């Protein structure tokens, strides 16, 4: 499935983690189709609603970013990657901390499965460092480098393994772009508007305009759209910010 990336709306990924039931989730999909480029299904939504939720979005003409961050032994991740391709998603994630061999097997699985199905392979994205973590958290876990240094190392490893790109903090976009090239896809979560959102656990954040101006290919936005009085209007406002960032 080809991903259009030639306009501002296509760069906006909505994090679909509804607090209600399946009907509420589908209501959001129907409301936001045409206002966002892709719907991100994470662990919460996928565990609650299952693969049929992906199918429901695809049937409505939406594109899906399956963000399950596969992180296991290479063979297990390769099989999970095959399943993701067969689901028909446009993009899915693995975790770069799984190592080069794991990522290489995932890349190989995606290519082989897509070729057998006669389809364009989905975009395979490797998660670097979660935006909820800062340098002190890494130190607690035994890392001897900063979040930015680790993200860059993992991005280079992902590129060398053949991944399409990475998920990385907005602050890490510039060094990753410089090291990995202009065709390396960078997806940035941790996107917030000027208003503080209740329950926010993100630590390393930027606005949509700032992230795109720094070179992000896609931005992921959840709460600022989902909790808005009018989610579609909120999505359109973010699209306008993306346009401003592209013109920077």
Q: What are the functions of these language-model segments?
A:
Residues 19-32, 74-83, 147-157, 203-210:
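Short, acidic/polar
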Residues 8-10, 76-164, 169-172, 179-183, ...:
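Conserved anion-binding
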Residues 14, 39, 69, 92, ...:
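Conserved, mostly hydrophobic/aromatic
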Residues 34, 60, 87, 161, ...:
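Structural motif
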Residues 87-101, 202-234:
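Glycine-rich phosphate-binding active-site loops on the catalytic face of alpha/beta enzymes
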Residues 103-113, 212, 225-248:
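C-terminal helical cap(s) of enzyme catalytic domains, especially alpha/beta-barrels
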Residues 1-27, 116-119, 174, 178-181, ...:
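N-terminal amphipathic alpha-helix/helix-capping segment at the start of soluble metabolic enzymes
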Residues 13, 37-40, 65, 93, ...:
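Conserved beta-strand positions in the central sheet of alpha/beta enzyme cores
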């Amino acid at each position: 499935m080809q991903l259009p990336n030639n306009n501002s709306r296509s760069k906006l990924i909505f994090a679909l983690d509804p607090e209600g039931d399946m009907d509420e989730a589908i209501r959001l999909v129907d409301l936001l189709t045409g206002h966002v480029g892709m719907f991100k299904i994470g662990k919460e939504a996928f565990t609650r609603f299952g693969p049929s939720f992906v199918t429901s979005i695809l049937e409505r003409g939406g594109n899906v970013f399956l963000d399950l961050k596969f992180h296991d032994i290479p063979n297990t991740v390769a099989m999970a990657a095959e399943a993701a391709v067969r689901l028909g998603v446009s993009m899915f994630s693995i975790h770069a901390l799984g190592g080069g061999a794991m990522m290489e097997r995932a890349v190989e699985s995606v290519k082989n499965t897509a070729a057998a199905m006669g389809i364009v392979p989905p975009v395979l994205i490797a998660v670097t460092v979660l935006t909820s973590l800062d340098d002190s958290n890494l130190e607690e876990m035994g890392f001897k480098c900063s979040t930015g240094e680790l993200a860059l190392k993992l991005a280079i490893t992902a590129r060398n393994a053949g991944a399409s790109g990475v998920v990385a903090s907005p602050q890490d976009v510039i060094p990753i772009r410089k090291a990995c090239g202009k065709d390396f896809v960078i997806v940035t979560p941790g996107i917030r508007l000027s208003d503080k959102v209740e329950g926010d656990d993100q630590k390393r954040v930027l606005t949509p305009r700032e992230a795109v101006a720094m070179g992000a290919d896609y931005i992921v936005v959840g709460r600022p759209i989902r909790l808005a009085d009018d989610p579609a209007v909120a999505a359109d406002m973010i699209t306008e910010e993306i346009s401003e960032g592209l013109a920077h």
